[in-house]
């Protein structure tokens, strides 16, 4: 199924779900991004010359979508106050940053969205959509199908690829780094590939073949960050394009995917807590869809298919965690669902993959990774505990019924390949060079006791040869919203910090999803303060166990993680020296009371409805970062915001920054002469995408800020960063 279940589980929190097999990014509602782009850069030369030698023709019927442009002319970043003298090593920093920013563009390539179909592999090479024979996929021998520059977009990349069943057509969704707008192009495959059509603002899309051997493209249309409409289209001599489903409830969104065996196309209608699935027969796609189970508040379910049976991952029944059930495809209603497999307590289902004779579950149990292999013939279960250093899965595109490949990674260790072979019943590890980080660093699984006695898991990294950890700098990371896990995929800048002696601590607080659905439920709505208490307990526990001290402790958060980070700055600023926030959500109350914002209704079950519920309003007032700013000492804070971010509007971040500076100035006045005010920096970046690529400039600016605030020498760290960015 290649990530489809993972995307389903994440889509419970997302408003623009993107489907599996194409390894694309998922976009959250107002405030978060599920899978950042950290794994999308690799070292490889573009082949632009060859790419442009075979430019495809463009049909006159195809619609070119105009490019979007943005301007910062009317927006000025807030200046840094109380600037400190430049450190002696500033020349070294500037030199390295210049090197990073001026690396030849052709040396870096977006990791290909790669799809295997028939005897070909379809992927992006430079600025082009290409395909090559499977056995030649690693060579330069490929056929150019479409030049992305024809769309006149700024630095476009392919986000998803779908190939029609008989390879007459290929559809590709194309977008840019600085915008969430996308274009789906349809390419007719022939000796001279032609762009048949293009559709703007497509979210999910899938191909099926009808009874007359005609390819039918189903796709969802996104409007104002909402995805409510489903269309189907045909091409060639019998062109059609019609809308056949519209979701009327604005709190729900719609996305599509095929079951792994392509037997059914599923229409998934869902919000944060409830889902409904309709089936379209892959053999007769013009027939009306069949409802599996009408939406029931609080019941989530996802559907896969094998041998005329539906396998349903659902939270129905007790306990209210995900479990696997099955039923005959011709009797899909909930009263016919039979329990097939249950998860242990404190278990998160990360992904599910269906094979001919096996079902593979990728799990996180008590903050450790497992793979469960279920034999569908005899209901046998084989549970494999994965290496303790592993913190994240990367699912691999796979159509081989004999093997289940995947990758494991951690924030400081690049992905490593593993393959489970069903015949041998064993897990095989990629052989070759062993990463030295395995010997030079340690990973610890710790727990902190929160205010109410709940044990909160933490994942901690540090160098094995570090002496006196209490004197080492500490970087804490938090999220705690939407039931989404902290992102723990490989990040070169995190590895560089550990190499330079830093301690990294990932705090898996309530509101996230690390311990299952209940862990999320215990940190949303009127339980949001649990997440804040958890974060406070984690930092105090780390200090109590000898990991760093407040004067060397920093905190970082992205998007909705800004709620807990900002709240901690208000309630316990003495625990922190410096904070970095990226596209942070900081004004919960005013945002959730503004129903004109496109995603407010979809967010009600996460934050509450302060417009109609006084209890929710008063509770949000109690923790909202913007509402609780007061004259006191604050840690230094570096905020990165994006000019046209539709999910976290710039206006709210600017208001927060101004109010914070006023409070700091008032506190400084009351404190008197000699008080050293913290630095508050607002870095406004151009662009309208909530999911901005981690540029060298942004990474180096954030690390520079942390080193300066802690008074550390950053000479070596930037040289190391340059090296690791070439992984």
Curated annotation (Swiss-Prot):
<dbReference type="GO" id="GO:0005634">
    <property type="term" value="C:nucleus"/>
</dbReference>
<dbReference type="GO" id="GO:0042147">
    <property type="term" value="P:retrograde transport, endosome to Golgi"/>
</dbReference>
<comment type="subunit">
    <text>Homodimer. Interacts with the AP-1 complex.</text>
</comment>
<feature type="active site" description="Charge relay system">
    <location>
        <position position="690"/>
    </location>
</feature>
<dbReference type="InterPro" id="IPR029058">
    <property type="entry name" value="AB_hydrolase_fold"/>
</dbReference>
<dbReference type="Pfam" id="PF00326">
    <property type="entry name" value="Peptidase_S9"/>
</dbReference>
<dbReference type="InterPro" id="IPR051543">
    <property type="entry name" value="Serine_Peptidase_S9A"/>
</dbReference>
<dbReference type="InterPro" id="IPR001375">
    <property type="entry name" value="Peptidase_S9_cat"/>
</dbReference>
<dbReference type="InterPro" id="IPR023302">
    <property type="entry name" value="Pept_S9A_N"/>
</dbReference>
<dbReference type="GO" id="GO:0004252">
    <property type="term" value="F:serine-type endopeptidase activity"/>
</dbReference>
<keyword id="KW-0378">Hydrolase</keyword>
<keyword id="KW-0645">Protease</keyword>
<dbReference type="GO" id="GO:2000300">
    <property type="term" value="P:regulation of synaptic vesicle exocytosis"/>
</dbReference>
<dbReference type="GO" id="GO:0005829">
    <property type="term" value="C:cytosol"/>
</dbReference>
<dbReference type="InterPro" id="IPR002470">
    <property type="entry name" value="Peptidase_S9A"/>
</dbReference>
<dbReference type="GO" id="GO:0043001">
    <property type="term" value="P:Golgi to plasma membrane protein transport"/>
</dbReference>
<dbReference type="GO" id="GO:0006508">
    <property type="term" value="P:proteolysis"/>
</dbReference>
<comment type="similarity">
    <text>Belongs to the peptidase S9A family.</text>
</comment>
<protein>
    <recommendedName>
        <fullName>Prolyl endopeptidase-like</fullName>
        <ecNumber>3.4.21.-</ecNumber>
    </recommendedName>
</protein>
<dbReference type="GO" id="GO:0005856">
    <property type="term" value="C:cytoskeleton"/>
</dbReference>
<keyword id="KW-0333">Golgi apparatus</keyword>
<keyword id="KW-0206">Cytoskeleton</keyword>
<comment type="function">
    <text>Serine peptidase whose precise substrate specificity remains unclear. Does not cleave peptides after a arginine or lysine residue. Regulates trans-Golgi network morphology and sorting by regulating the membrane binding of the AP-1 complex. May play a role in the regulation of synaptic vesicle exocytosis.</text>
</comment>
<keyword id="KW-0963">Cytoplasm</keyword>
<dbReference type="Pfam" id="PF02897">
    <property type="entry name" value="Peptidase_S9_N"/>
</dbReference>
<dbReference type="GO" id="GO:0005802">
    <property type="term" value="C:trans-Golgi network"/>
</dbReference>
<feature type="active site" description="Charge relay system">
    <location>
        <position position="645"/>
    </location>
</feature>
<keyword id="KW-0539">Nucleus</keyword>
<keyword id="KW-0720">Serine protease</keyword>
<feature type="active site" description="Charge relay system">
    <location>
        <position position="559"/>
    </location>
</feature>
<dbReference type="GO" id="GO:0008233">
    <property type="term" value="F:peptidase activity"/>
</dbReference>
């Amino acid at each position: 199924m290649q990530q489809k279940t993972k995307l389903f589980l994440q889509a419970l929190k997302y408003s623009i779900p993107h489907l599996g097999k194409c390894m694309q990014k998922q976009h959250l509602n107002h405030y978060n991004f599920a899978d950042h782009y950290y794994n999308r850069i690799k070292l490889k030369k573009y082949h632009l010359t060859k790419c442009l030698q075979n430019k495809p023709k463009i049909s006159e019927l195809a619609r070119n979508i105009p490019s979007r442009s943005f301007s910062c002319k009317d927006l000025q970043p807030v200046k840094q106050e109380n600037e400190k003298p430049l450190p002696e090593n500033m020349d070294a920093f500037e030199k390295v940053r210049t090197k990073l920013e001026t690396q030849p563009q052709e040396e870096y390539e977006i990791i290909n969205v790669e799809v295997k179909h028939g005897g070909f592999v379809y992927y992006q090479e430079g600025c082009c959509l290409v395909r090559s024979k499977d056995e030649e996929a690693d060579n330069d021998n490929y056929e150019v199908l479409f030049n992305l520059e024809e769309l006149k977009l700024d630095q476009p990349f392919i986000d998803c690829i779908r190939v029609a069943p008989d390879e007459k057509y290929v559809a590709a969704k194309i977008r840019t780094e600085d915008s969430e707008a996308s274009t789906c192009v349809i390419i007719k495959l022939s000796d001279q590939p032609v762009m048949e059509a293009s559709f703007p603002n497509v979210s999910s899309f899938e191909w099926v073949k009808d009874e007359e051997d005609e390819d039918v493209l189903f796709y969802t249309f996104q409007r104002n960050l909402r995805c409510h409409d489903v269309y189907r289209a045909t091409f060639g001599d019998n062109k059609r394009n019609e809308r056949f489903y519209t979701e009327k409830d604005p709190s729900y969104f719609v996305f599509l995917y095929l079951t792994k065996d392509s037997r059914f196309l599923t229409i998934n209608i869902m919000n944060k807590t409830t889902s409904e699935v309709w089936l379209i027969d892959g053999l007769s796609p013009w027939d009306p869809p069949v409802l599996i189970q009408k939406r029931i508040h609080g019941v989530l379910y996802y559907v896969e298919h094998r041998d005329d049976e539906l396998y349903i991952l659902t939270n129905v029944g007790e306990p209210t965690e995900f479990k696997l059930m099955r039923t005959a495809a011709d009797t899909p209603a909930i009263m016919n669902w039979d329990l097939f497999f249950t998860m242990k307590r404190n278990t998160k289902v990360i992904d599910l993959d269906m094979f001919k004779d096996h079902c593979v579950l990728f799990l996180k149990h008590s903050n450790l990774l497992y793979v469960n292999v279920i034999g569908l013939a005899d209901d046998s279960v084989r549970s494999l505990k994965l290496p303790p250093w592993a913190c994240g899965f990367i699912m691999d595109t796979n159509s081989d019924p004999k093997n289940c490949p995947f990758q494991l990674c951690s924030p400081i260790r690049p992905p490593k390949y593993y393959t489970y072979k069903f015949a041998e019943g064993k897990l095989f590890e990629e052989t070759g060079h062993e990463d030295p980080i395995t010997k030079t660093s340690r990973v610890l699984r710790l727990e902190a006791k929160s205010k109410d006695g709940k044990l909160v898991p933490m994942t901690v990294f540090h160098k094995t040869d570090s002496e006196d950890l209490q004197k080492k700098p500490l970087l804490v990371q938090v999220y705690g919203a939407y039931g989404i896990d902290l992102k723990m995929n490989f990040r070169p800048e995190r590895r560089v910090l550990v190499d330079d002696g830093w301690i990294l601590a990932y705090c898996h607080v309530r509101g996230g999803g690390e311990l299952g659905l209940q862990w999320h439920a215990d940190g949303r709505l009127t339980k949001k303060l649990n997440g804040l208490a958890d974060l406070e307990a984690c930092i105090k526990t780390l200090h109590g166990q000898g990991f760093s001290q407040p004067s060397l402790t920093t905190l970082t958060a992205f998007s909705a993680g800004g709620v807990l980070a900002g709240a901690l700055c208000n309630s316990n600023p003495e625990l922190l020296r410096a904070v970095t926030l990226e596209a942070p959500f900081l004004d919960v109350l005013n945002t959730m009371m503004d129903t004109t914002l496109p995603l407010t209704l979809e967010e009600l079950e996460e934050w509450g409805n302060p417009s109609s519920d006084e209890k929710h309003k008063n509770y949000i007032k109690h923790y909202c970062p913007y509402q609780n700013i007061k004259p006191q000492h604050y840690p230094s804070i570096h905020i990165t915001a994006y000019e046209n971010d539709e999910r976290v509007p710039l206006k709210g971040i600017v208001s927060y920054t101004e109010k914070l500076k006023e409070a700091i100035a008032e506190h400084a006045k009351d404190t008197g002469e000699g008080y050293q005010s913290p630095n508050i920096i607002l870095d406004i970046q151009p662009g309208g995408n909530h999911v901005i690529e981690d540029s060298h400039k942004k990474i180096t600016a954030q690390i520079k800020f942390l080193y300066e605030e802690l008074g550390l020498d950053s000479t070596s760290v930037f040289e190391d960063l340059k090296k690791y960015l070439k992984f």
